Amino acid sequence: MKEPLKVACVQAAPVFLDLDATVDKTITLMEQAAAAGAGLIAFPETWIPGYPWFLWLDAPAWNMPLVQRYHQQSLVLDSVQARRISDAARHLGLYVVLGYSERNKASLYIGQWIIDDHGETVGVRRKLKATHVERTMFGEGDGASLRTFETPVGVLGALCCWEHLQPLSKYAMYAQNEQIHVAAWPSFSLYRNATSALGPEVNTAASRVYAAEGQCFVLAPCAIVSPEMIEMLCDSDAKRSLLQAGGGHARIFGPDGSDLATPLGEHEEGLLYATLDPAALTLAKVAADPAGHYSRPDVTRLMFNPNPTPCVVDLPDLPISSESIELLRPDIALEV
């Protein structure tokens, strides 16, 4: 990161379970950010087509109609809707870090898509481990999803939600000299009276600690639960007590953990703005670089596999002979 960068951090409600309408809103927010002079905009977790709150409200059998609709409204990267977003990024000259539900063949993944100011894909990642009931609908990422990307605006990285409570995953990111991190959150509207672990105090603190631990800028976009979503999902008083409207707590933190933008009210839609000064990175790293001069690899080290792990690996074409079988299966020897 060589030059100051103005960034925008989204706090808004998607058009729930409506892919095309949420793409429209995505582009509108991108246009607002670009008009304000921002060079990068960050969106919440599963912004498209919205976070599947219904998974937390009832039994899997009750959710099946909504699960089917969620599949249909999730984003395919090679699609007209995705091209609309990348074309808008190119037209506006804007970097975009988009949280979305990725539909790949018959599976869904909690994804983040990084697009550069030319509309080209910088990187695509998937949440390594879906959280709790999310695992009834979403698949998993692999080590290739724990990486940073060197760009003209800085070294970019991203994680989703409770990935920020995974110390080893965070350390893998810190070790790659991450400079601008997007910590994407869905909203802090769930189980408010039952547990602090899902609330804004704990999870906003996780984003702030990430900034201080990694000495990087952290953009923490956060969605809002709209009254329309409550009307759609909560058909009883019990469900309305579990999921409440609001929950927006978007933040931007400096590499020393300081607030760089004034938060919005939890029901308020808008964009948070801040100008990131690269000099702040140097000052923070001088004090503590946990994967550099402040580390003790002779005492503790992280084992990290950054390679993709596809379900099917094509073997090379080999002539059918005893030698080729021995090459593929050294435990088998055939007599000819």
UniProtKB/Swiss-Prot annotation:
Pfam families per record: CN_hydrolase
Output the Gene Ontology terms for molecular function.
Answer: indole-3-acetonitrile nitrilase activity; nitrile hydratase activity
State what the entry records as the consequence of deleting this gene: Cells lacking this gene are unable to grow in medium in which the sole nitrogen source is either indole-3-acetonitrile (IAN) or phenylpropionitrile (PPN). Their growth is also moderately reduced in medium with ammonia as the nitrogen source; one possible explanation for this phenotype is that the disruption of Psyr_0007 results in the accumulation of endogenous nitriles that can no longer be degraded and which inhibit bacterial growth.
> Does the keyword section mention Endoplasmic reticulum?
no
- In short, the EC number is 3.5.5.1
General function of this protein: Arylacetonitrilase which is capable of hydrolyzing indole-3-acetonitrile (IAN) to the plant hormone indole-3-acetate (IAA), and allows the plant pathogenic bacterium to use IAN as a sole nitrogen source. Is also able to hydrolyze phenylpropionitrile (PPN), allowing the use of this compound as a sole nitrogen source. This enzyme may represent an additional mechanism for IAA biosynthesis or may be used to degrade and assimilate aldoximes and nitriles produced during host plant secondary metabolism.
Protein name per its UniProtKB record: Nitrilase
